[in-house]
């Protein structure tokens, strides 16, 4: 059952003892907690995330001539020019470690807000702790649809979720079919955490609704040492489109195993995650010419909005990489949160929450191809329009929707 915030009654007396001293009227700095995997198999995600958040913090704390919230002027004008200070925490891709780190950030580091977390499974526990302490949590890059449907008052997500992303995929399939492409059967391949499960559920529902046949629906254990049996099943099913929902390590293993077993599908349309990461293409990019991934961000937007390219160069100077689907959402996560804190003119959790609820940021004032940032009563931004990107010649180009596309899709993939 979907729970809205109107259904939730939080007893002030019961929770008052848990609220940290975050109601200081004026402060020289605003401390925001950032929780990501900084060690383990997903560590590179966390390292890149640090650079994205540091880029956003630099833009906020210094003066830049960009049409972006908080770029002009130094610091948060609503708090007397207070600077943003980030405190990073390592959840090690472990939901329980994430829970502990969130509590440490709130009770010891005295953060007024938390942003995270890459893995949706970690966002579940982190957001629960933030709710308990009445501290706003912003899912910068978590995409599981169920996250915003738990009735949490302090949960917000500016980016699309996997139902929105999957709808874009099926809109693309429909458009391709109208153009003469043969797309009738699908194979789903997904890991067994909340990310993979929610993604597969969304795709299954859309396939039924749009008249596509799922000939294989394969769930595997995340971080499996072998995917040979699963790839044999995919090869036997021989669907028109393979739709993987896998993080980077699993994605690399999937592609290597497909090559070893001689399985080359006509098309791969991926639910992002590992398939948007440079590490995957560094490892197996030679086998993925023409792969399609959904996304929130396209560097092609810089042609229409020059500040996107300039901010990308700021990030690249720190990271050695261009923005991708994750780092762009992480950057915007801090901009959205800091903008709310600035409008709240406070580091009190409830006042920041109220400012987040009132957010209405035009898409032109972001680095994303979104209409705007405006949250519904469950904390979801429904105006974050996805795009589809195709990997061609060592880079991604936007192929869908038509109003954002800079190239025609290559179908089938090479």
What do the PLM-derived regions correspond to, one by one?
Residues 1-3, 15-16:
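Secretory targeting signals
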